Amino acid sequence: RPTLVFNLCDGYDDVGAPGLSVVRALEEAGLAYTGADSRYYEISSSKLVMKELFRGAGVPTAGWEALPESGPVDGLCERLGAPLFVKPSASCASYGIGLESVVHTDEQAAARRDTLRSGEFAKWFAGDTIFAEHFIDGAEYTVLMGGYWDDPDGIWSLPPAERIFDNSIPESERFLSYDRYWGYYKEETPPEDGRAF
């Protein structure tokens, strides 16, 4: 009788949240499973790897630069064009994303990097690259796609979904931060009257 494993493990193994190791074990065992295969998992776990693939395929993406582990980032804003968005390369569910992720100076960029290295999320990003990319102000969309890398004609997608933010939020803050994603509001003020962002 065929077996299908519903794989809900999509974490990062190096911080104790099973992910790629489970996918590889399922593949080695020859079991059918739901979710991405190991090849996709490997390339999609790093935003920098994805951005390089986008660039190589001619897909427009905001300019970016990996930040040094510590010290100043002189000329960063001039090279990429402020404002910038500072974030970890390997992150999901808005971990490490906050209102301070949008920076306007080199000093703010270095400070945000240092916060990611030493703050609440430091354990998640210990071996990760922190990078900055040009902040694109505008609508935020999500598109779910499926298929196989070796069968590009079989790739499908659902209609794009736009995240609509409350008009009270300044345009430069209309992105999904950790507080908004999870509704914890540790760094941000919750919306008035229980309104959703």
PLM feature spans:
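Conserved N-proximal alpha/beta basic substrate-recognition cap immediately N-terminal to
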Residues: 1-66
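Generic preference for hydrophobic
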Residues: 5, 33, 64, 86, ...
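Flexible, active-site-adjacent loop/turn segments at secondary-structure boundaries
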Residues: 10, 31, 38-42, 65, ...
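Short connector loops/turns at beta-strand edges and beta->alpha or beta->beta junctions
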Residues: 31, 89-91, 183
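Active-site nucleotide/adenylate-binding loops and adjacent lid/helix of ATP-dependent enzymes
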Residues: 41-131, 137-139, 148-151
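Phosphate-binding site of ATP-dependent enzymes
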Residues: 108-195
